[in-house]
């Protein structure tokens, strides 16, 4: 059986990218999408006006793909994912520590090597994407990745930036929170009296999952601009399971939140009018309710993207343990409830069969086989296409290692 170490030793030196660029700057606020060009002397950036067509120069094969739903069947699994030039989004998610980032990065490399200009984005606070590519991807900037045959860019988003945006959406004219929100209406003295509405908690504390949702919505805004329509494959390395599920419920949460503010408005409308008439005080700029409504609209757009069966697919990543499989089953059920399309399940870190007398290896593999049996018998997971990824002898870092992993998973 081939190992990563032998693959890397036999691989030719990493070739330089087949593209160059001079200007890639986005006007999106909160995240500066200007490219980083100081990584190395050979790193270059893609021009905004460059138009690329996808070239499918690979040899088409009819591949054997394992499915837990039925015996081995003949289909072209990766050909389905790589075909066409219409933009597609792939969200990879699952329990923390199962290898989501490595799988996402390997898919991005695979797409690029098959001619697709690709962007891989991490919204995971752990910032593991930098480790996977062995490049510094932090700072909210698009970074070109060298090696693939088509342009590949990577981006890590700082969730704290998203939290700051939520706080700014709930503040009046540069204020610091709910007190300024009320002061801006001339009603600061009513804050304590209206404490049962918990408005301060609402406006000053971002709800769980909002940071990732805002980050994804910003990337969508960025990709909708004409100068970036070259990307035909977008791969998201999402945060652990809980964040993803909370993200999908955010529009409903914000509906309730805005409802609280509107309820507050109704209670104090007459008092506001009286104070304005006496002191001549005028509202300046949009209020918190208006800002949060715009934010809610963006969250709805993110949820709609997750549910778009034509352009989006969520890929669950797990490992062969009882706990991980159980969480993956719950994730699959929750995604189905939210109408998110899920077709594939990656089981990562599988031990290969061994002819040695390693007792630990034998016991561990039997334990993993029991976990695979759980998947085959699970009502949620058994319908998904099973994709197996082995436990390799070296850490997956850098494009050559990601190419090795991608050739195994994404057949």
Swiss-Prot record:
Gene3D superfamilies: P-loop containing nucleotide triphosphate hydrolases. Pfam families: ArsA_ATPase. Its EC number is 3.6.-.-. GO terms for cellular component: chloroplast stroma. InterPro entries: Anion-transp_ATPase-like_dom, ATPase_ArsA/GET3, P-loop_NTPase. Residues 1-67 form a transit peptide. ATP binds at residues 95-102, 348. CDD domains: ArsA. The active site is at 124. Disruption phenotype: No visible phenotype under normal growth conditions. Keywords: ATP-binding, Chloroplast, Hydrolase, Nucleotide-binding, Plastid, Transit peptide. Belongs to the arsA ATPase family. This is ATPase GET3B.
């Amino acid at each position: 059986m081939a190992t990563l170490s032998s693959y890397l030793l036999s691989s030719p030196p990493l070739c330089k990218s087949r593209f160059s660029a001079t200007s890639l700057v986005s006007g999106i606020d909160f995240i500066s999408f200007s490219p980083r060009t100081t990584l190395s002397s050979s790193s270059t950036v893609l021009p905004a006006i460059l138009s690329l067509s996808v070239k499918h120069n690979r040899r088409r094969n009819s591949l054997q793909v394992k499915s837990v739903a039925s015996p081995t069947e003949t289909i072209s699994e990766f050909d389905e994912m790589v075909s066409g030039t219409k933009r597609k989004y792939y969200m990879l998610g699952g329990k923390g520590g199962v290898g989501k980032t490595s799988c996402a990065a390997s898919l991005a490399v695979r797409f690029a090597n098959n001619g697709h200009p690709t962007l891989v984005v991490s919204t995971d606070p752990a910032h593991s994407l930098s480790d996977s590519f062995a490049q510094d991807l932090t700072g909210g900037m698009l970074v070109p990745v060298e090696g693939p045959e088509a342009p590949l860019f990577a981006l890590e988003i700082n969730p704290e930036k998203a939290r700051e945006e939520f706080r700014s959406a709930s503040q009046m004219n540069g204020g610091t929170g709910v007190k300024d929100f009320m002061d801006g209406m001339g009603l600061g003295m009513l804050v304590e009296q209206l404490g049962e509405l918990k408005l301060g908690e609402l406006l000053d504390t971002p709800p769980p999952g909002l940071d990732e949702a805002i980050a994804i919505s910003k990337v969508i805004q960025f990709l909708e601009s004409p100068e970036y329509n070259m990307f035909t494959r977008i791969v998201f390395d999402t945060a652990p399971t809980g964040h993803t599920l909370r993200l999908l419920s955010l529009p409903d949460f914000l509906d309730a939140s805005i409802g609280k503010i509107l309820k507050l408005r109704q209670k104090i409308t007459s008092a506001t009018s009286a104070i304005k008439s006496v002191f001549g005080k005028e509202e300046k700029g949009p209020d918190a309710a208006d800002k949060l409504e715009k934010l809610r609209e963006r969250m709805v757009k993110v949820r709609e993207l997750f549910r778009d069966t034509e352009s989006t697919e969520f890929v669950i990543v797990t490992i062969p343990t009882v706990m991980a499989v159980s969480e993956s089953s719950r994730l699959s059920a929750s995604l189905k409830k939210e109408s998110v399309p899920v077709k594939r399940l990656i089981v990562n870190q599988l031990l290969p069969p061994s002819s040695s007398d390693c007792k630990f290896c034998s016991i561990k593999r039997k334990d993993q086989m029991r976990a695979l049996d759980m998947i085959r018998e699970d009502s949620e997971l058994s319908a998904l296409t099973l994709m197996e990824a082995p436990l390799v002898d070296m850490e997956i870092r850098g494009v050559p290692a990601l190419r090795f992993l991608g050739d195994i998973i994404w057949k």
